[in-house]
Amino acid sequence: MPRPTGKKFDKRRQQQNPLFKRKKFCRFTAANVDHIDYKDLETLKDFIGENGKITPARLTGTKSHYQRQLDTAIKRARFLALVPYTDQHKA
């Protein structure tokens, strides 16, 4: 059975997700960062999702070199209780 290639199919493809059309770039490369520090909580919180997971590089545009450093820094900050493991605590 052939794949649908009509106008209806093309319209669906164009409307899929307009939020991810912006060009992704590595914030750390643009700022000439040598090392990501675990004490810089404002930067780390930008890369942690709503549920406490580390946002993957394919969504943020971070290069793999900096993604590994970011991963280590977030885990160190969590271990030292600077950043919570999850954001779903009931107070």
UniProtKB/Swiss-Prot annotation:
Pfam families: Ribosomal_S18. The keyword Ribosomal protein applies. GO terms for cellular component: cytosolic small ribosomal subunit. Keywords: Ribonucleoprotein, Ribosomal protein, RNA-binding, rRNA-binding. GO terms for biological process: translation. The keyword rRNA-binding applies. GO terms for molecular function: small ribosomal subunit rRNA binding; structural constituent of ribosome. Binds as a heterodimer with protein bS6 to the central domain of the 16S rRNA, where it helps stabilize the platform of the 30S subunit. NCBIfam families: S18 (TIGR00165). Belongs to the bacterial ribosomal protein bS18 family. Part of the 30S ribosomal subunit. Forms a tight heterodimer with protein bS6. This is Small ribosomal subunit protein bS18. The gene is rpsR.
